[in-house]
A protein has these predicted regions:
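Extreme N-terminal tail/first-helix region
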Residues: 1-17
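Short linear motifs in intrinsically disordered
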Residues: 6-10, 54, 117
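Short secondary-structure boundary/capping segments
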Residues: 9, 35, 108-111
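Short beta-strand segments
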Residues: 14-49, 57, 63-67, 76-80
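A short, aromatic/hydrophobic, helix- or strand-capping loop or linear motif
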Residues: 22-23, 67-69, 107-114
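Short acidic (Asp/Glu) patches
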Residues: 48-51, 60-67, 95-108
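Short, surface-exposed beta-strand-loop junctions and turns on beta-sheet-rich folds
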Residues: 51-53, 72, 134-136
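Charged, gly/pro-rich active-site loop segments
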Residues: 76-140
Length: 140
């Protein structure tokens, strides 16, 4: 397996991740759309201002995520642990990138840009899984 090649393929094909947080030993997970900046190894996602997960980020910025496969029955995925923080970029700064990844996202951005805050996930390693027997940890 060419793990890095598979990492980039999966991270670019998938539209959503399951983002896991934990506060006071109480785990929480939610589905978010994302855009991955390959040049800087940063994953961006946007959420509405005032959502519960934002307060969780301030209390504990350690996160984990897994990509959600696009095809039913497919188990391939990218998993990683990292840190989340508020981005200096706005949703309008990343409008083109998000829109290229998810065509209907441009309408959401245009309607709700003032209500959306961008966050970024930074991570240095990921586990690339093709199936239950084929997986590999990579450094980025």
């Amino acid at each position: 397996m060419e793990a890095k090649k598979e990492f980039f393929r999966m991270i670019n094909e998938c539209d959503e991740i399951a983002l896991a947080t934990s506060i006071h030993d109480m785990p929480n997970v939610r589905i978010v759309n994302y855009y991955y900046d390959q040049d800087n190894n940063i994953m961006y996602f946007a959420t509405y201002i005032g959502r519960e997960k934002i307060s969780e980020f301030w209390k504990n910025n350690n996160i984990a995520f897994t990509t959600i496969p696009m095809k039913k029955g497919i188990r391939e995925q990218v998993r990683a642990r990292g840190h989340v923080r508020e981005s200096e970029k706005s949703i309008m700064d990343l409008r083109e990138e998000f829109s290229n990844k998810m065509s209907d996202f441009a309408d959401i951005i245009d309607k709700y840009s003032k209500e959306l805050k961008v966050y970024e996930i930074r991570f240095t390693e990921a586990t690339v899984t093709l199936d239950s027997r084929t997986y590999e940890k990579i450094s980025l």
